[in-house]
Amino acid sequence: MPVPKKKTSKARSRRRYAVWLGKAKLQAQRAMTIGRAILSGRNTGFYYPKAKSEEEEGEE
């Protein structure tokens, strides 16, 4: 016979939300760090498509 589940306490729900939010903040921080590295030219450990320069576009 089916039995209703127990309600999750607010403390547990808030703790799970805080963990989720912390992970999201960490990912955002990492993305900003990579973005800053690309813009400053200090990138060494990853690849990304480079935009064509004006000289290359003029030759075509």
UniProtKB/Swiss-Prot annotation:
Keyword terms: Ribonucleoprotein, Ribosomal protein
Any one of the GO BP annotations: translation
Keyword Hydrolase: no
Coiled coil: none
Entry keyword annotation includes Protein biosynthesis: no
MF terms in GO: structural constituent of ribosome
Cellular component, GO annotation: large ribosomal subunit
UniProt-listed InterPro entries: Ribosomal_bL32
Highest taxon of source: Bacteria
Annotated family: Belongs to the bacterial ribosomal protein bL32 family.
Name of the protein in question: Large ribosomal subunit protein bL32
Species: Synechococcus sp. (strain JA-3-3Ab)
Origin organism lineage: Bacteria, Bacillati, Cyanobacteriota, Cyanophyceae, Synechococcales
